[in-house]
Amino acid sequence: MAKIVGIDLGTTNSLIAYLEGGRPTIIPNAEGSRLTPSVVAFTKDGQLLVGEPAKRQAIVNAERTIKSIKRHMGTNYKVKIDDKEYTPQEISAMILRKLKKDAEAYLGEPIEKAVITVPAYFSDAQRQATKDAGAIAGLEVVRIINEPTAAALAYGLDKEGHQKILVFDLGGGTFDVSILEIGEGVFEVIATAGNNRLGGDDFDERIVNWLVEMFMEEHGINLKEDRTALQRLFEAAEKAKIELSSKLQTEINLPFIAMKGNTPLHISVTLTRAKFEELTYDLVEKTKEPTERALKDAGLSPSQIDKIILVGGATRMPCIQEWIKKHFGKEPQRNVNPDEAVALGAAIQAGVIGGEIRDIVLVDVTPLSLGIETLGGVFTKIIERNTPIPVSKSQIFTTAADYQTSVEIHVLQGERALAKDNISLGRFILDGIPPAPRGVPQIEVTFDIDVNGIVHVSARDKATGREQRITISNAIRLSEEEIKRMTEEAKRFEEEDRKRREEIETKNQAEHLIYTARKTLKDYGDKVSKDLVQRVEDKIKNLEELIKPERINVEQVKKGMEELTQALGEIGQFMYQSASAAGNPGQGQTNENPGGKTIDGDYKVN
């Protein structure tokens, strides 16, 4: 049976893991790193870069480099490069395809199935977009699992006894907090809360804004209007944030960040940890409300939490750790790698699904309530948040006007009292209802949430017993045709990458052959005929011309290499024959001239 891998598709970094001997293991990427930056870039010559290569060139190619695309999943956001628009699903698929390809090279076998993690507070549209991204990348997503739940699996795999644990997950772009009960192989989520618009990126942005404001005051130049300068600022801000987790202050030096007239301008400032915490105080405060809500929903006080697990690189910030320690009265666990826990947990869940791990039961919950819009724009809940999944619930609705033959049902997800303040999942048209006074028809609407947290809805007219087929008119979701088209486009990118690699390898081989040919002429040119030397030089010049373009014709270059190799072979043959003749005086040499100087024209090479 082919391996099922676990993937943490992160805002800042992504990871892929698998089970080896019953233990989850991170798979390194082609660059040798366990973390793959969630960055995609399109070079001006049409090359696609993903991961570290894309991140390295971001400063010089800021307008064609995409990062933090996860923050746009489940929206109609588009990335425009040249004349083509890309959805968040397509960009995410490029990251997934990179992970898949590198893992296949590492494991030496094809990968077709994966468990992919998402923030616990992801909506239905965001979860569906993640599944679509997997499909475009050529992966069957066998399960969508919440990130805090995955981290809990990684923590609790070998733990004995019963524990109540809180997973505090502050990633690059999202924040989740989940409370679980674990014991005897059962991992049960009892409450979850979060904020999909809060993460490490926001902390970086506060540093950037501080630098921009200072520079504006001093020089009157807005650095946010320069994409390249802004990219440099964000990279410096991220580096400063990381350094301040272990240092009390850090230096930010950005030479030649702008020009004023003919004068270059620089940034050179010291950022202290105290100043950083002042700039980001309100962001830390934003983590408190979801934490309190999760505790309240679970019916627990902070003192009843046995262990606290930190997930996400942003939890390394001292201000986060200090708040947690103060609020819960205990130190968070240090034996879980915050960058890797989610991917490791996804690999464990993959092992459960694949039958490699037994005696583990995972019970997750829906993070948001589900319901419909009713008269007056009110949001009527049908499935409450933190309900264990999978789940199915039904409710009877009726018409609001006399003799209605159709109704529009607006399905929503959220916690607000009014429909307009919640997340719209789609509008369902149910027609064919027999005419009757208002309040008489009985329409049974059923909500199903599967193990992936994805919502399915059906409706049935109880009077006729006829079940109506309902289609979600949600423009954000991709159709099967769109997924198929995007999958084919992704394959074309893969084919283009293969061609590009072949061009580079062929060009390198040609350059090496040219170097060898020139060295051969230097060493032996005076020992062979001028005609042969000229032919070799002509072949060298021809090959040099063939490899001049940015995009070479591989077949033509290979032919040129073959011709040059053949000409070099004639030199080798000549030298071999000369050496043989020199070593045998009975064949064309006399003892009066040992080794005999070769004279042009003595040999004719056929």
Curated annotation (Swiss-Prot):
CDD domains: ASKHA_NBD_HSP70_DnaK-like. Acts as a chaperone. Keywords: ATP-binding, Chaperone, Nucleotide-binding, Phosphoprotein, Stress response. This is Chaperone protein DnaK. One of its GO terms (molecular function) is unfolded protein binding. Residues 579-606 are annotated as: Disordered. The modification Phosphothreonine is found at residue 174. The keyword ATP-binding applies. Belongs to the heat shock protein 70 family. Residues 579-593 have a biased composition (Polar residues). The keyword S-adenosyl-L-methionine does not apply. It comes from Dictyoglomus thermophilum (strain ATCC 35947 / DSM 3960 / H-6-12). Coiled coil: none annotated. Induction: By stress conditions e.g. heat shock. HAMAP family: DnaK.
